[in-house]
């Protein structure tokens, strides 16, 4: 049964400040958290009850140990994670403003995950792959870019759903043009595209989403997140909306990852195949969007990314607190 969520990409340590409203140079202390968008998504899906597996490489160092221990505690399959003594685990330092919005400084050139190669990716890893998710951070010119291409090929051979979140981090690219061109190169592989309003503007120069399928014609479902303005789900038949939930956000790190993970989890929970994606009803898609929107909101009420991802029980409590109903359409 192809019921595994597989993610490929960066694995790093987020150093989150213990105070808000200070510039990075003025922060006195940090707390370390397991991070990287693919890692966040695998952990969140596992916390909700899905099977998830990570394809990446970490250093043979204390930070790599911490990432693997954290993922194991979340019940994420780490059998496809490689270790290397040649390159260190990547690091990111985060500054938070008074509203929990982030500013990143990265230390990842060179780093372990960028040196996972296509030769490290094998067909046996994909035998039970139902969904493959990836982002753009590790699509810079490196061995890992070609590992992505092989992973996508192997996932497609399993008829898996391909999910892509551009997750734009411009400081990691040689130029804005290189970032944009690479994202547009990989977007056609995706059945599901999760994108923020800022990323849509960066890629298209437009904030008008009504013609989004002219830019991404191969996508079956597009998920557009707009922060406090809520979120949208678009297919070629339906345009759906959910308003934001009035939480007190303290850290938005990983909120988009929480949204994506919640959506992908529901597809796995309900055994939705790639062939079924275009035929999902408006009502079911609205439920999926409401669930994802709420799960992302909940994640902003805690510090860190993996740590902030709710378990099913924790999410039930959040839904009750905000009187959100009609979310679950089947038991986990």
Show where each model-derived region lies.
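Glycine-rich phosphate/adenosyl-contacting loop at the front of the ribokinase-like
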Residues: 1-77, 328-332
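Conserved N-terminal subdomain of the carbohydrate kinase-like
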Residues: 51-134, 317-332
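Conserved beta-alpha-beta core of the PfkB/ribokinase-like small-molecule kinase fold
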Residues: 137-211, 229-230
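Alpha-helix C-terminal capping/helix-to-coil transition sites in glycosyltransferase folds
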Residues: 127-128, 188-189, 218
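Structural alpha-helical scaffold elements that stabilize or flank donor/cofactor-binding regions
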Residues: 124-125, 185-186, 215
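Glycine-rich phosphate/pyrophosphate-binding beta-alpha loops
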Residues: 90, 136-140, 296, 302-305
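Conserved phosphate-binding/catalytic region of the ribokinase-like
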Residues: 1-6, 153, 208-332
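Structural motif
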Residues: 6-8, 131-133, 163, 194, ...
